[in-house]
Structures are given as structure tokens and as C-alpha cells.
Amino acid sequence: MPELPEVETSRRGIEPHLVGATILHAHIRNGRLRWPVSDEIYRLSDTPVLSVQRRAKYLLLELPDGWIIIHLGMSGSLRILPEALPAEKHDHVDLVMSNGKILRYTDPRRFGAWLWTKELEGHNVLAHLGPEPLSDEFNGEYLQQKCAKKKTAIKPWLMDNKLVVGVGNIYASESLFAAGIHPDRLASSLSTEECDLLARVIKAVLLRSIEQGGTTLKDFLQSDGKPGYFAQELQVYGRKGEPCRVCGTPIVATKHAQRATFYCRHCQK
């Protein structure tokens, strides 16, 4: 599933081609996504794009009368293409732009979403979200406060959007490795120093992935059709049985809440 770096990479890639241009119309080939494509999107016509923003793993296209909320789901990607390029099997939504480009949404599993809202505030998919991990609000003090009485393993807690948004399976595993923290540790067992370090490395890992265009394991592509290159820098995720890049100990794979977790027994305590 695309996580924060992949969604932010998509935002940065599509923004220059959308802001200041006008949506001439939308072409919906298959509106049966995780939720049906909103009727308002079908009716788009001569609509300028004012901004392209992101909240958690949602892309937000600001229009004069409302917002398009896009979620990439498990396998979605957005590309900027010439208008004349024929669609393929899993290309479900096109926004045809006034500058001769299209924003094309591709999603083999069809678990993404294209929704419409007049107001972002209070929308059900955006309500009750925690802070952005790259914001000043997310720091060691905040993390310690939220972990202090939490009797659950730190790995799934990092993936809870009520704590912090956008830190999915890949980046939770990578951040815990960078901080030297075992994924099975109770959140409440983390010291002040460990919370401070973990908050800092989460930011560093996410920023590095954004610099590399995100992580492509299977389906994700940047807006120019290129893969994300952070996969080449993964320390533990997806490396079961391979030697730790630091100490040589084989990487272990377990499961938390049905999600794969990767770690080094020697480096993470």
C-alpha cells in the first residue's frame, strides 16, 4: 500500500501540471472502487484546480466549489500523460486538462477512492487523524505522552492513524530498525530518550524516501511512470533471512495484526 512518501511523491509530481490548469472533463471507465466514485466527479466540466494538497495518505484537489479526495488504496498510482495515450485495463479514471495533459489513475485491485466533498473539515475519512509525522507537533515529547500508558507493541501503535498519520508497514519497520527498538516492545516501555530518537528517525526515514521517490515493491509508480527508488535502501523490510546490513545477523520476519514485521534480533532491543 502506498504510504506517506509515495503519496507525497505523487502530490509533488502532479501539482505543477494541475494547478493553474482547468479540468475539461472527467472520464470514468470503472467507478467501482473501494467506494463508488462520487457523482460530482462525473459531472466535472471547465473546473480550475486551485491547489494540490495532502493529508495523511489522502491527496486533496482543491476546486472552486469543493474538493476531490483521492486515496491510492493498495495498488493505485497517478500519472501525468499526453491526452492521446490510450487507456489500458486498470486505468479507471482520467482528468482531462486544458494544457493537453491527463491525470490518469491506475489501480489493479480497485481498492482506492475518488470522493467529493464541499468542506474538508469533518469529512469522515479525514476526521480523528493524528498529526503529520513531518510536522513540529510530532516530536519526542508528544510520542512519549501517547506511549506512556499504551500496553501494546510499538510497531502496530506507530501504524495507528490516531497516533500519527502515514507511517505504514514499511516505514514503521524501517524506523524501528534505525532507532534500535524491537517491534515487540510495549509502547509504554520506551524511555524519554528512545521516544525522542524514534520521532527523529521517523522524520528522517520518511524524508529520505520522499527524496528517492518513495518505495516501489510492486505497483506504485511516480507521476512520470518511474518507480520509487527507496526500495534499494531498505534495511529490514522484505529482507527475511538476508544478513543485516549492520551486523550480518539474518533478518527475522514475524506478524503483528496480520501485517508482516521485519527486524534484526541483534540490533533491535
From Swiss-Prot:
The active site is at P2, E3, K57, R259. Its EC number is 3.2.2.23, 4.2.99.18. Binds 1 zinc ion per subunit. Pfam families: Fapy_DNA_glyco, H2TH, zf-FPG_IleRS. Its cofactor is Zn(2+). A zinc finger (FPG-type) spans 235-269. Signal peptide: none annotated. It comes from the Bacteria. InterPro entries: DNA_glyclase/AP_lyase_DNA-bd (IPR015886), DNA_glyclase_Znf_dom_DNA_BS (IPR015887), Formamido-pyr_DNA_Glyclase (IPR020629), FPG_cat (IPR012319), MutM-like_N-ter (IPR035937), Ribosomal_uS13-like_H2TH (IPR010979), Znf_DNA_glyclase/AP_lyase (IPR000214), Znf_FPG/IleRS (IPR010663). It catalyses: Hydrolysis of DNA containing ring-opened 7-methylguanine residues, releasing 2,6-diamino-4-hydroxy-5-(N-methyl)formamidopyrimidine; 2'-deoxyribonucleotide-(2'-deoxyribose 5'-phosphate)-2'-deoxyribonucleotide-DNA = a 3'-end 2'-deoxyribonucleotide-(2,3-dehydro-2,3-deoxyribose 5'-phosphate)-DNA + a 5'-end 5'-phospho-2'-deoxyribonucleoside-DNA + H(+). GO terms for molecular function: 8-oxo-7,8-dihydroguanine DNA N-glycosylase activity; class I DNA-(apurinic or apyrimidinic site) endonuclease activity; damaged DNA binding; DNA-(apurinic or apyrimidinic site) endonuclease activity; zinc ion binding. Keywords: DNA damage, DNA repair, DNA-binding, Glycosidase, Hydrolase, Lyase, Metal-binding, Multifunctional enzyme, Zinc, Zinc-finger. One of its GO terms (biological process) is base-excision repair. DNA binds at H90, R109, K150. CDD domains: EcFpg-like_N. SUPFAM superfamilies: Glucocorticoid receptor-like (DNA-binding domain) (SSF57716), N-terminal domain of MutM-like DNA repair proteins (SSF81624), S13-like H2TH domain (SSF46946). PANTHER family: FORMAMIDOPYRIMIDINE-DNA GLYCOSYLASE. Belongs to the FPG family. Involved in base excision repair of DNA damaged by oxidation or by mutagenic agents. Acts as a DNA glycosylase that recognizes and removes damaged bases. Has a preference for oxidized purines, such as 7,8-dihydro-8-oxoguanine (8-oxoG). Has AP (apurinic/apyrimidinic) lyase activity and introduces nicks in the DNA strand. Cleaves the DNA backbone by beta-delta elimination to generate a single-strand break at the site of the removed base with both 3'- and 5'-phosphates. Monomer. This is Formamidopyrimidine-DNA glycosylase. It comes from Salmonella typhimurium (strain LT2 / SGSC1412 / ATCC 700720).
